[in-house]
Amino acid sequence: HKQSLTGQQIHKMLVDQGFDISYCTIINKIREKNKKAKECFIKQSYNYGERLEYDFGEVKLLINGSLGTYHMAVISSPAGDFRWAYLYRNQKKEAFLDSHVKFFEMVGGVYKEVTYDNMKNVVTKFIGKNQKELNEDFLKLSIYYGFNINVTNCFSGNEKGHVEGSVKIIRSYVFANKYEFPSLEHAQIYLHSQLLKLNENSKMDEEK
Protein backbone atom coordinates (compact mmCIF):
# COMPACT_ATOMS: atom_id res chain seq x y z
CA HIS A 1 0.00 0.00 0.00
CA LYS A 2 1.06 3.63 -0.43
CA GLN A 3 2.89 5.19 2.47
CA SER A 4 1.75 8.60 3.73
CA LEU A 5 4.32 11.02 5.09
CA THR A 6 3.50 13.40 7.92
CA GLY A 7 4.26 17.10 7.73
CA GLN A 8 7.16 16.64 10.13
CA GLN A 9 8.65 13.85 8.01
CA ILE A 10 8.37 15.92 4.83
CA HIS A 11 9.94 18.92 6.58
CA LYS A 12 12.85 16.80 7.88
CA MET A 13 13.47 15.28 4.44
CA LEU A 14 13.60 18.69 2.78
CA VAL A 15 15.87 20.19 5.44
CA ASP A 16 18.19 17.16 5.18
CA GLN A 17 18.38 17.82 1.44
CA GLY A 18 19.50 21.39 2.10
CA PHE A 19 16.23 23.29 1.58
CA ASP A 20 15.63 26.32 3.81
CA ILE A 21 11.92 25.97 4.48
CA SER A 22 9.82 26.28 7.64
CA TYR A 23 7.51 23.62 9.05
CA CYS A 24 4.56 26.05 8.86
CA THR A 25 5.11 26.51 5.12
CA ILE A 26 4.98 22.74 4.64
CA ILE A 27 1.73 22.44 6.62
CA ASN A 28 0.11 25.29 4.68
CA LYS A 29 1.04 23.69 1.36
CA ILE A 30 -0.38 20.34 2.47
CA ARG A 31 -3.65 21.99 3.52
CA GLU A 32 -3.85 23.88 0.24
CA LYS A 33 -3.33 20.68 -1.76
CA ASN A 34 -5.90 18.75 0.27
CA LYS A 35 -8.45 21.53 -0.21
CA LYS A 36 -7.98 21.48 -3.99
CA ALA A 37 -8.30 17.71 -4.04
CA LYS A 38 -11.68 17.92 -2.31
CA GLU A 39 -13.08 20.37 -4.86
CA CYS A 40 -15.13 18.65 -7.52
CA PHE A 41 -17.93 19.75 -9.79
CA ILE A 42 -20.94 17.47 -10.02
CA LYS A 43 -22.77 17.59 -13.34
CA GLN A 44 -26.31 18.75 -12.73
CA SER A 45 -29.35 17.30 -14.45
CA TYR A 46 -32.65 19.12 -14.85
CA ASN A 47 -36.18 18.36 -15.92
CA TYR A 48 -37.58 19.81 -19.13
CA GLY A 49 -38.80 23.37 -18.66
CA GLU A 50 -37.06 23.70 -15.32
CA ARG A 51 -33.98 25.82 -15.96
CA LEU A 52 -32.44 28.33 -18.34
CA GLU A 53 -28.97 29.85 -18.15
CA TYR A 54 -28.10 33.36 -19.35
CA ASP A 55 -24.88 35.07 -20.35
CA PHE A 56 -23.41 37.70 -22.66
CA GLY A 57 -20.63 36.99 -25.13
CA GLU A 58 -18.72 39.28 -27.46
CA VAL A 59 -18.24 38.79 -31.20
CA LYS A 60 -16.33 40.90 -33.72
CA LEU A 61 -18.27 41.65 -36.90
CA LEU A 62 -17.63 43.73 -40.00
CA ILE A 63 -20.86 45.68 -40.43
CA ASN A 64 -21.19 47.92 -43.48
CA GLY A 65 -17.39 48.00 -43.81
CA SER A 66 -16.76 48.90 -40.17
CA LEU A 67 -15.22 46.39 -37.74
CA GLY A 68 -16.79 46.46 -34.29
CA THR A 69 -17.47 44.44 -31.17
CA TYR A 70 -21.06 43.30 -30.76
CA HIS A 71 -22.74 41.55 -27.87
CA MET A 72 -24.63 38.28 -27.98
CA ALA A 73 -27.25 37.69 -25.33
CA VAL A 74 -27.09 33.89 -25.06
CA ILE A 75 -29.83 31.82 -23.43
CA SER A 76 -29.54 28.05 -23.11
CA SER A 77 -31.49 25.11 -21.71
CA PRO A 78 -29.30 22.38 -20.17
CA ALA A 79 -32.10 19.79 -20.20
CA GLY A 80 -33.08 20.36 -23.81
CA ASP A 81 -29.52 21.13 -24.96
CA PHE A 82 -31.01 24.17 -26.70
CA ARG A 83 -29.05 27.36 -27.43
CA TRP A 84 -30.26 30.72 -28.66
CA ALA A 85 -28.78 34.20 -29.07
CA TYR A 86 -29.56 37.79 -30.04
CA LEU A 87 -27.13 40.47 -31.21
CA TYR A 88 -26.95 43.88 -29.55
CA ARG A 89 -24.66 46.89 -29.72
CA ASN A 90 -24.14 46.85 -25.95
CA GLN A 91 -25.01 44.97 -22.76
CA LYS A 92 -27.15 47.70 -21.25
CA LYS A 93 -30.34 47.03 -19.33
CA GLU A 94 -32.57 47.64 -22.34
CA ALA A 95 -30.79 44.93 -24.35
CA PHE A 96 -30.77 42.59 -21.36
CA LEU A 97 -34.52 42.88 -20.76
CA ASP A 98 -35.36 42.82 -24.48
CA SER A 99 -33.56 39.50 -24.96
CA HIS A 100 -35.78 37.88 -22.32
CA VAL A 101 -38.95 39.17 -23.95
CA LYS A 102 -37.84 37.96 -27.38
CA PHE A 103 -36.87 34.52 -26.09
CA PHE A 104 -40.07 33.87 -24.14
CA GLU A 105 -42.15 35.01 -27.10
CA MET A 106 -40.21 32.70 -29.41
CA VAL A 107 -40.57 29.56 -27.27
CA GLY A 108 -44.13 30.43 -26.32
CA GLY A 109 -43.66 29.95 -22.60
CA VAL A 110 -41.53 30.50 -19.50
CA TYR A 111 -39.11 28.29 -17.59
CA LYS A 112 -39.30 27.87 -13.82
CA GLU A 113 -35.84 29.32 -13.19
CA VAL A 114 -33.21 31.38 -14.99
CA THR A 115 -29.60 31.37 -13.77
CA TYR A 116 -27.24 34.34 -14.06
CA ASP A 117 -23.82 35.42 -12.89
CA ASN A 118 -23.37 38.62 -10.88
CA MET A 119 -23.70 41.00 -13.85
CA LYS A 120 -24.81 44.59 -13.24
CA ASN A 121 -28.14 44.02 -14.95
CA VAL A 122 -28.98 41.43 -12.29
CA VAL A 123 -27.22 42.52 -9.10
CA THR A 124 -27.42 46.20 -8.17
CA LYS A 125 -25.17 45.87 -5.12
CA PHE A 126 -23.80 43.41 -2.59
CA ILE A 127 -24.93 43.58 1.03
CA GLY A 128 -22.45 41.81 3.26
CA LYS A 129 -20.90 38.53 2.16
CA ASN A 130 -23.94 36.67 0.93
CA GLN A 131 -26.80 39.12 0.38
CA LYS A 132 -27.43 40.68 -3.04
CA GLU A 133 -29.79 43.47 -4.02
CA LEU A 134 -31.36 42.68 -7.39
CA ASN A 135 -32.10 45.23 -10.09
CA GLU A 136 -35.64 46.56 -9.63
CA ASP A 137 -36.60 46.56 -13.33
CA PHE A 138 -35.30 43.03 -13.68
CA LEU A 139 -37.32 41.92 -10.65
CA LYS A 140 -40.45 43.38 -12.24
CA LEU A 141 -39.73 41.42 -15.42
CA SER A 142 -39.32 38.15 -13.49
CA ILE A 143 -42.56 38.76 -11.58
CA TYR A 144 -44.42 39.58 -14.81
CA TYR A 145 -43.29 36.37 -16.51
CA GLY A 146 -43.27 34.30 -13.34
CA PHE A 147 -39.76 32.83 -13.29
CA ASN A 148 -37.38 32.46 -10.35
CA ILE A 149 -34.00 34.21 -10.39
CA ASN A 150 -30.94 32.17 -9.48
CA VAL A 151 -27.65 34.09 -9.13
CA THR A 152 -24.43 32.09 -9.03
CA ASN A 153 -21.70 32.49 -6.44
CA CYS A 154 -18.89 34.86 -7.39
CA PHE A 155 -16.23 33.34 -9.68
CA SER A 156 -18.27 30.15 -10.09
CA GLY A 157 -18.73 29.85 -13.82
CA ASN A 158 -19.26 26.11 -13.45
CA GLU A 159 -22.68 26.89 -11.91
CA LYS A 160 -23.88 27.97 -15.35
CA GLY A 161 -21.51 25.90 -17.43
CA HIS A 162 -24.02 25.09 -20.18
CA VAL A 163 -24.48 28.69 -21.26
CA GLU A 164 -20.78 29.50 -20.99
CA GLY A 165 -20.10 26.59 -23.33
CA SER A 166 -22.97 27.75 -25.54
CA VAL A 167 -21.39 31.19 -26.01
CA LYS A 168 -18.26 29.55 -27.42
CA ILE A 169 -20.22 27.08 -29.55
CA ILE A 170 -22.44 29.75 -31.12
CA ARG A 171 -19.54 32.12 -31.74
CA SER A 172 -17.46 29.47 -33.53
CA TYR A 173 -20.36 27.72 -35.31
CA VAL A 174 -22.02 30.88 -36.61
CA PHE A 175 -19.36 33.54 -37.04
CA ALA A 176 -16.02 31.74 -37.49
CA ASN A 177 -16.24 31.74 -41.30
CA LYS A 178 -18.75 34.51 -41.93
CA TYR A 179 -18.50 37.79 -40.07
CA GLU A 180 -19.15 40.45 -42.74
CA PHE A 181 -22.67 41.83 -43.20
CA PRO A 182 -24.24 44.93 -44.77
CA SER A 183 -26.16 45.68 -41.57
CA LEU A 184 -26.71 44.40 -38.04
CA GLU A 185 -30.17 43.27 -39.12
CA HIS A 186 -28.62 41.02 -41.78
CA ALA A 187 -26.25 39.59 -39.17
CA GLN A 188 -29.25 38.94 -36.93
CA ILE A 189 -31.09 37.08 -39.69
CA TYR A 190 -28.01 34.99 -40.44
CA LEU A 191 -27.57 34.18 -36.74
CA HIS A 192 -31.20 33.06 -36.56
CA SER A 193 -30.84 30.76 -39.58
CA GLN A 194 -27.67 29.15 -38.22
CA LEU A 195 -29.19 28.62 -34.78
CA LEU A 196 -32.04 26.68 -36.38
CA LYS A 197 -29.45 24.30 -37.84
CA LEU A 198 -27.48 24.14 -34.59
CA ASN A 199 -30.59 23.17 -32.63
CA GLU A 200 -31.88 20.50 -35.02
CA ASN A 201 -31.04 17.75 -32.52
CA SER A 202 -32.12 19.63 -29.40
CA LYS A 203 -35.03 18.54 -27.19
CA MET A 204 -36.88 21.86 -27.38
CA ASP A 205 -40.10 20.21 -28.59
CA GLU A 206 -40.10 17.99 -25.50
CA GLU A 207 -39.73 21.05 -23.28
CA LYS A 208 -42.77 22.82 -24.68
What are these regions (language model features)?
Residues 2-14:
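Short, charged amphipathic recognition helices of the HTH superfamily
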Residues 12-24, 28-83, 91-98, 143:
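Mobile-element integrase/transposase regions
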Residues 85-110, 134:
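Active-site beta-loop-alpha junctions of metal-dependent nucleic acid enzymes
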Residues 110-130:
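Acidic/histidine-rich, metal-coordinating catalytic segments
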Residues 116-117, 128-129, 149-171:
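RNase H-like two-metal-ion nuclease catalytic core shared by retroviral integrases
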Residues 137-139, 143-160, 179-181:
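RNase H-like polynucleotidyl transferase catalytic core
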Residues 167-208:
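Active-site-proximal acidic segments at structured loop/helix or strand boundaries
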